[in-house]
């Protein structure tokens, strides 16, 4: 289908088709992503409401389904107030510096076989590099606001994100070792081969079983990376109000939240691709194989996002020193140890990957 569209595009538009096709693919990623964020926020409010034995939003539209539209309109109509004491240029560019890396990562994310904007061989390296850039926007927001609360929140965010990126990096290196590729599509395909996959039990051939500690560390570190509860000391309401976002309002404030929810979707998608078989069904059969792979990936991402929300509803916020201790004294030693174990496992006669 995609090859046919490409050939027809070249025939109709000639040399102008290549940049036009890039633009079309970017729009096809960004627009659904914005809709997903809007309804992820609604799902979060609904799910937490059910966990609290209440209804959640149910007034705007049938079953509250138009609530995200109302929220967007409210934010668009709010005035963006710029305090006089801020460093205006850096203050205004900080939300964009947080949002842009979150959107840029989607260029290499495959949605199913051969459905990806840029199928680069170093896709995993690209993800690691781009995901670490967002912290600069957070630091800049804290510093440019010229507020001690914002600056303290920015410093907390920087330390937390850098600390947990190390553990996430080791987890990704382990996936690289067992799959033998930095290409995200190749990593997914490598999980759907082997003894159990040949029997049709794909779920037992995915990386989540042999790399279970890495699976847990990566996902929990992802929760910390996105500054979500219980790792949200960056915006601890009882201590520093909204942290680095305290001087922002209106749509500028909304951009930080947009980046946060996009990062949640990114962490869930990458976790599904690296550890849960990507777009492969859990069991191979005539019925499951007839369902497009994109829907299987969507189901896995939805379940992981629901875990994000469940964690928020269930756990108290950690103290800052507890978060740092977990990252440096538990996760990093655990990932290094499992990395060594997997390296020995690969070289042993019991190698299950190659």
UniProtKB/Swiss-Prot annotation:
<dbReference type="InterPro" id="IPR001694">
    <property type="entry name" value="NADH_UbQ_OxRdtase_su1/FPO"/>
</dbReference>
<keyword id="KW-0997">Cell inner membrane</keyword>
<keyword id="KW-0874">Quinone</keyword>
<comment type="subunit">
    <text>NDH-1 is composed of 14 different subunits. Subunits NuoA, H, J, K, L, M, N constitute the membrane sector of the complex.</text>
</comment>
<feature type="transmembrane region" description="Helical">
    <location>
        <begin position="255"/>
        <end position="275"/>
    </location>
</feature>
<feature type="transmembrane region" description="Helical">
    <location>
        <begin position="203"/>
        <end position="223"/>
    </location>
</feature>
<feature type="transmembrane region" description="Helical">
    <location>
        <begin position="91"/>
        <end position="111"/>
    </location>
</feature>
<dbReference type="GO" id="GO:0003954">
    <property type="term" value="F:NADH dehydrogenase activity"/>
</dbReference>
<dbReference type="GO" id="GO:0048038">
    <property type="term" value="F:quinone binding"/>
</dbReference>
<keyword id="KW-0520">NAD</keyword>
<feature type="transmembrane region" description="Helical">
    <location>
        <begin position="326"/>
        <end position="346"/>
    </location>
</feature>
<comment type="similarity">
    <text>Belongs to the complex I subunit 1 family.</text>
</comment>
<dbReference type="Pfam" id="PF00146">
    <property type="entry name" value="NADHdh"/>
</dbReference>
<keyword id="KW-0812">Transmembrane</keyword>
<keyword id="KW-1003">Cell membrane</keyword>
<keyword id="KW-0830">Ubiquinone</keyword>
<keyword id="KW-0472">Membrane</keyword>
<keyword id="KW-1133">Transmembrane helix</keyword>
<feature type="transmembrane region" description="Helical">
    <location>
        <begin position="124"/>
        <end position="144"/>
    </location>
</feature>
<comment type="function">
    <text>NDH-1 shuttles electrons from NADH, via FMN and iron-sulfur (Fe-S) centers, to quinones in the respiratory chain. The immediate electron acceptor for the enzyme in this species is believed to be ubiquinone. Couples the redox reaction to proton translocation (for every two electrons transferred, four hydrogen ions are translocated across the cytoplasmic membrane), and thus conserves the redox energy in a proton gradient. This subunit may bind ubiquinone.</text>
</comment>
<keyword id="KW-1278">Translocase</keyword>
<protein>
    <recommendedName>
        <fullName>NADH-quinone oxidoreductase subunit H</fullName>
        <ecNumber>7.1.1.-</ecNumber>
    </recommendedName>
</protein>
<dbReference type="InterPro" id="IPR018086">
    <property type="entry name" value="NADH_UbQ_OxRdtase_su1_CS"/>
</dbReference>
<feature type="transmembrane region" description="Helical">
    <location>
        <begin position="22"/>
        <end position="42"/>
    </location>
</feature>
<dbReference type="GO" id="GO:0009060">
    <property type="term" value="P:aerobic respiration"/>
</dbReference>
<dbReference type="GO" id="GO:0016655">
    <property type="term" value="F:oxidoreductase activity, acting on NAD(P)H, quinone or similar compound as acceptor"/>
</dbReference>
<feature type="transmembrane region" description="Helical">
    <location>
        <begin position="168"/>
        <end position="188"/>
    </location>
</feature>
<dbReference type="GO" id="GO:0005886">
    <property type="term" value="C:plasma membrane"/>
</dbReference>
<feature type="transmembrane region" description="Helical">
    <location>
        <begin position="291"/>
        <end position="311"/>
    </location>
</feature>
